[in-house]
């Protein structure tokens, strides 16, 4: 159920020792020709932003991290676009104008934590996953695309 896993369990009357914080990550596609990917330090922050060439003319720029209410639309806000572009422009000799933004998109990351724990800074929150078994129900909390196969293998071994 992805970001809705904890809600689904609650609405089903199943108690879990985990919950999920929802973090929106937004990205921009920009007209920018790069030969190599870049990792940029966000000035004054402990965050990084990446710039990955998509083809000879465009690059993927991201990402942001903002707590997200699942009742709200999952979109890249104007403020996030400005934030990402400003970080990129601090590292370019010639700033990229907003007219070079081709498109934007956003997604929600499910950040797992024990129900009684509090996470202050989402940038430092764990991207790990947790597996919880309740009778014949296997629930997966958190995780990342890069570890999805390994997580799937762990779940398959429980079946």
Which positions does each model-derived feature cover?
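Short glycine-/small-residue-rich Rossmann-like dinucleotide-binding loops
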Residues: 1-3
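C-terminal catalytic lobe of FAD-dependent flavoproteins
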Residues: 7-61, 66-159
């Amino acid at each position: 159920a992805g970001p809705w896993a904890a809600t689904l369990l609650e609405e089903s009357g199943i108690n879990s020792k985990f919950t999920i914080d929802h973090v929106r990550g937004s990205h921009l596609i920009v007209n920018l020709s790069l030969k190599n990917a870049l990792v940029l330090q966000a000035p004054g922050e402990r965050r990084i932003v990446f710039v990955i060439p998509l083809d000879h003319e465009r690059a993927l720029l991201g990402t942001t991290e903002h707590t997200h209410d699942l009742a709200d639309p999952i979109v890249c806000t104007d403020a996030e676009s400005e934030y990402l572009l400003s970080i990129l422009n601090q590292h370019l000799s010639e700033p990229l104008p907003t007219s070079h933004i081709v498109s934007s998109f956003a997604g929600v990351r499910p950040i797992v934590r024990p129900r009684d724990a509090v996470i202050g800074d989402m940038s430092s929150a764990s991207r790990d996953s947790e597996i919880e078994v309740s009778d014949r129900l296997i629930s997966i909390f958190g995780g990342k695309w890069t570890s999805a196969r390994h997580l799937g293998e762990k779940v398959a071994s429980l079946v």
